């Protein structure tokens, strides 16, 4: 592909996905219960071959998939994204046994995955998490840990079949003392409660009462779990932007149709300059956000050294743009857009959360600024910065960098997704 356009095959695939979302997935979504995992919808995503693509697609294809689904069915987009977020650490860092047990079931929609990072007192400052993984000597058995504490704002909780859980194995070590665990939902001591959120997706809290885990449950290496989290988020942040772009485009399309047909003041709304200029601004911002999302995803796929900055820029611009565009669309539609069941009423509830989860807008600005200054300092000092996917973030003298190693915090797609 070129820097500023998609290939015909990619455009055709996006059109096919929009049609599938409208014709096959939207009916399944409408039968779901708000706030609950829609297993029929997940099975539909698996049957259509979309869930397996979470593990075979690059970042750009993931963005195209999420944008296209979001345009016609935000519930399908979110169900797919949450499967990817929860299962990507297993795909990228799991053992053969872990992958063999869970990934086929994630791919066909029969197992629900969840990404459990945020806590009541550790959202944006994710490195401050306190879920304790206390050593469990287990006389006569393999040594392990006991998980004690809470997770909150966890998408797909408490109905998920397994959780990627991030817990503190080394107290006082900050981001360097966190380990990622694969925790099946049936482990003794693990309980959860649903949370009633603005948007209709399943969100919950988890309580860990000495939940047993072993070395066989570790994803990656002990005390290196924050790299697992940040590697996952660097992949998914641009595609959160794609989700936002899909919603913005849906709102823009609805606004074009409405203003072209609506009679007011002796003519059509489209003929009023104040309306036309607002529509033009909505289109300008949507297309700008789309291009930045595609650029960030392409940088990830190319192994570019500035992925954390580009991913943060893409998520920030796209989610803020979608909020603006949907709000303008509601304004131009008037009261009808606030009626329960209207497309824009639905989008208005959906569009708010992406500015919070997987790194709030304020966090993204912090990442961008730190990356800019880190690059400036690295140039001046002649040091290497981040690895191609941005997950290591180590200079040549072996010191960890902020944001590249993930010290810029996150609230994952757990907060009102």
Enumerate the predicted regions with their spans.
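Alpha-helical interface subdomain recognition
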Residues: 1-72, 93, 105, 109, ...
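A short, charged helix-loop
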Residues: 204-232
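A short, Trp-centered hydrophobic/proline-enriched beta-strand micro-motif
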Residues: 109-117
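A short core secondary-structure module
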Residues: 142-144, 148-191
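A structural signal for short hydrophobic beta-strand segments in well-ordered beta-sheet cores
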Residues: 131-135
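N-terminal glycine-rich flavin-associated loop
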Residues: 77-97, 123
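Flexible, small-/acidic-enriched active-site or ligand-binding loops
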Residues: 185-212
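Active-site-adjacent elements of ketosynthase-type condensing enzymes
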Residues: 121-130
